[in-house]
Design a protein with these regions (language model features):
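Catalytic core of pol beta-like nucleotidyltransferases
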Residues: 1-27, 33-39, 49-108
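Short, conserved active-site loops that position catalytic residues or coordinate cofactors/metal ions
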Residues: 41-43
Length: 108
C-alpha cells in the first residue's frame, strides 16, 4: 500500500471510530483491501451495526461523512450499511462471499 493509501485508510479509521455507534464494525473490501487498487479505485466500505438500524438521520450522517471525507482527497468512498442480522442473511450471495474473502477490518 502506498503512503497516500495508508493516509486515506487512517482517515477512514479515525472517522469510523469517532462517528459510528459502539459495537459497529467497519471493513474495507474490494481492490483497496486486496492491494490491487489503481490510483482511480474507489474505497468500498462495509458498516455493520448491532441490533436495529439507527434513525434515518444517523444513517444519512454516517453515509455522508464517509462520502464527503473523500472529496478533498479526490477519492470516492462507497459505504454500505447493514445490521449484523441483515448481513448474515446475505451469506449465500456473491457479494457477501466477495467481501468476506478479501476484507480488512478497520474498526470493531
Amino acid at each position: 500500500m502506498s503512503n497516500r493509501q495508508l493516509e486515506i485508510e487512517g482517515l477512514i479509521k479515525c472517522l469510523g471510530a469517532d462517528i459510528l455507534p459502539k459495537n459497529a464494525w467497519l471493513m474495507l473490501f474490494g481492490s483497496q483491501a486486496r492491494d490491487e487498487a489503481t490510483p482511480n479505485s474507489e474505497w468500498d466500505l462495509l458498516i455493520l451495526l448491532e441490533g436495529e438500524k439507527e434513525s434515518n438521520d444517523d444513517f444519512d450522517r454516517w453515509m455522508f461523512s464517509f462520502i464527503s471525507l473523500g472529496w478533498p482527497l479526490g477519492v470516492e468512498n462507497n459505504p454500505v450499511v447493514y445490521t449484523y442480522d441483515e448481513w448474515r442473511q446475505r451469506q449465500i450471495t456473491p457479494f457477501y462471499k466477495n467481501v468476506m474473502k478479501g476484507m480488512v477490518e478497520l474498526v470493531s
